[in-house]
Amino acid sequence: MVALRLIPCLDVANGRVVKGVNFVNLRDSGDPVELACKYSEAGADELVFLDIRASVENRKTLVDLVSRTAKSVKIPFTVGGGINSINSINDLLRAGADKVSLNSSAVKNPDIISKSSTNFGTQCIVIAIDARKKITKYNEWEVYVKGGRENTGLDVISWAKKVEELGAGEILLTSMDGDGTQNGYDLLLTQTVANAVNIPVIASGGAGSVEDIYDVFTKGKASAALLASLLHDKKLTIDEIKSFLIEKKLPIRPN
């Protein structure tokens, strides 16, 4: 059985790790390189580094920061934010990233998914989907871009199927309603997307306890759990989470 993964997420703005609630009210959580080293040494299975301002301000992700961070860790590392060309992907992979995460650019130009997966391999291409519940529907969600500021009107499930067809290797699925709340993952959203595709789904948005993480693996059918506030706020450690999940007989890589 493939091991389930715990993935700390480093949201970066202006060179600092930040975290908010529902994509707003951002607060400083530390230096990205220091936190990357800390989580790598603590037993994280992978890391995700997202320049959350890049898409909004049309800037390239800071390649030098990526390079310094990637050189500091020995685990797989995904980079996202403002990536809108094959050249940008190439620059980031050369800077040390193992994978790139595409969001706004993939919605605007879906061909970038197929072209990048052909050029670099599907294993390098992660499609980030920021999902928000439709007010009038219990089990329907819409895709948002530009850091959660713009509603595309796209149905999340249809888009997830489309990106898989185009060559995405993974989906990074964020519940905007749960982001930063520590009230638990959106299990219905995660399970619905996981059941609709045959590629790994990384669940994001809402982790507040070890039980939440257990639930997103067992009920949500996620292949990986993204962790941010829970770790940045020192509510739990990676070791504590892994110990709990191993006791529950889940396939987790021990520290």
Curated annotation (Swiss-Prot):
It comes from the Bacteria. GO terms for molecular function: imidazoleglycerol-phosphate synthase activity; lyase activity. One of its GO terms (biological process) is L-histidine biosynthetic process. Its EC number is 4.3.2.10. Keywords: Amino-acid biosynthesis, Cytoplasm, Histidine biosynthesis, Lyase. Disulfide bonds: none annotated. InterPro entries: Aldolase_TIM (IPR013785), His_biosynth (IPR006062), HisF (IPR004651), IGPS_HisA/HisF (IPR050064), RibuloseP-bd_barrel (IPR011060). It is an enzyme of class 4 (lyase). Pfam families: His_biosynth. It catalyses: 5-[(5-phospho-1-deoxy-D-ribulos-1-ylimino)methylamino]-1-(5-phospho-beta-D-ribosyl)imidazole-4-carboxamide + L-glutamine = D-erythro-1-(imidazol-4-yl)glycerol 3-phosphate + 5-amino-1-(5-phospho-beta-D-ribosyl)imidazole-4-carboxamide + L-glutamate + H(+). GO terms for cellular component: cytoplasm. It is found in: Cytoplasm. Pathway: Amino-acid biosynthesis; L-histidine biosynthesis; L-histidine from 5-phospho-alpha-D-ribose 1-diphosphate: step 5/9. PANTHER family: IMIDAZOLE GLYCEROL PHOSPHATE SYNTHASE HISHF, IMIDAZOLE GLYCEROL PHOSPHATE SYNTHASE SUBUNIT HISF/H IGP SYNTHASE SUBUNIT HISF/H. HAMAP family: HisF. Belongs to the HisA/HisF family. NCBIfam families: hisF. Heterodimer of HisH and HisF. This is Imidazole glycerol phosphate synthase subunit HisF. The gene is hisF.
